[in-house]
Amino acid sequence: MKNTVWGPPEMRRIRRIHFVGIGGSGMCGIAEVLLNQGYEISGSDLKESATTRRLSDMGASITFGHTAQNIAGANVVVTSSAVAKDNPEVTAANEQRIPVIARAEMLAELMRYRHGVAIAGTHGKTTTTSLMASVLGEAGLDPTFVIGGRLNSAGTNAKLGASRYLVAEADESDASFLHLTPMVSVVTNIDADHMHTYGGDFEKLKQTFVDFLHNLPFYGVAVMCYDDPVVREIIPRVGRSVITYGFNEKADVRAVDIAQQGMQTSFTAKRPGGHPDLRISLNMPGKHNVLNALAVIAVATDEGIADEAIVSALNKFQGVGRRFQVYGNYPVDEGSVMLVDDYGHHPREVDATIKAIRDGWPEKRLVAVFQPHRYTRTRDLYEDFVQVLSKVDVLVLMDVYPAGEKEIPGADGRSLCRSIRQRGQLDPIFIERGQDVKAVLSGVLQDGDLLLTQGAGDIGAVAGVLAEGGLQ
């Protein structure tokens, strides 16, 4: 009888795989999938986290701190762009002629024998990848997925599935997404971020996205957001089949009749080729999430997935950790405050979140605690940050989370605070330490406020502490 159970070929000679920085959002998912495929996994990180504990419980051998001894027995060493070239584990691997590869190269190996769906773009990758994995799962296709955030319904950011489908984020931050060879590629948007990778040349960034799309086979498909002006600009350069999506009437898959009420955003998706309209009700606020859902509808329709599965998965979607994560309502003097935590760290992401809050909760005063992420990003997008952060009602500004970078004069939290104050729309409060947030908030919060903690650094832990200990 013909064997219908499919499994990817094993990597020859590879038994033990070591991850430097295994707790990172891009690393832990790949490690988990490989662990479930039967490989021995070891890894190192600077400190313990919920992620490292989960991997340890699954059988990974994890050490804290970086030393040459950590790579003992490894056949390959996987690193991310956050790992320094002179890291002692990387140095030892090079000396011992153990291959050292980028995380995207290992992801590419996982994708090579699968039907890969790669989600690229400056913003929206994690949510779109999560929605895509949920739709495939609802259709009974049991995908493997690797996501940069925790998919709430699965309780994890990675899973080894039984089918040929693999859904993953494609990271442009270090141009490593060029390693990937998917069957379907989505581009959500293209914005000026991680410009150090591209020598400050925006044209080079755009061309790199085109090169990424040309990694598709000639029978592959590029799914591109028509509403994003930069994505729209590069469409004529793409020598593959293209499906567009957006609010624009010229988009192939488009949304009409959009309505938002609190967390609920409903819309009608119109599709080409005689496909019936789909009425969707997302448990996520904001038009940016409608675009994320449209990308998934475009892919799912092209893949021949049943409409019932598409609608059901999108309507049931429970969100992703730290993507507009609502902790709930917490008592304050004479009332209560709604606490929301979000990962947004680029001015465009912050702006999208503010718009979603204004549309969904127009009566609420918006109190934001924002932590800038990276000195280079703060410097490069300084005026954009000043403009967008001036749109909230009350702003508590933390100092920059360095993410390994050296301080850049004039691109720190104090300077940003001063510039926002000089703009004259509000008087921000600057704090140096996360542990001071609660005390500062006690003097500003009022009944009915929406409290937003936002940033890609350790501010997520601040939100967790506030949720656990309350706001009083």
UniProtKB/Swiss-Prot annotation:
Family statement drawn from the similarity comment of this UniProt entry: Belongs to the MurCDEF family.
EC number annotated for this UniProt entry: 6.3.2.8
Pathway(s) it belongs to: Cell wall biogenesis; peptidoglycan biosynthesis
Compartmental location: Cytoplasm
Gene3D superfamilies in UniProt: Mur ligase, C-terminal domain (3.90.190.20), Mur-like, catalytic domain (3.40.1190.10), NAD(P)-binding Rossmann-like Domain (3.40.50.720)
Organism the protein comes from: Hahella chejuensis (strain KCTC 2396)
Name the record gives this protein: UDP-N-acetylmuramate--L-alanine ligase
Entry keywords, A to Z: ATP-binding, Cell cycle, Cell division, Cell shape, Cell wall biogenesis/degradation, Cytoplasm, Ligase, Nucleotide-binding, Peptidoglycan synthesis
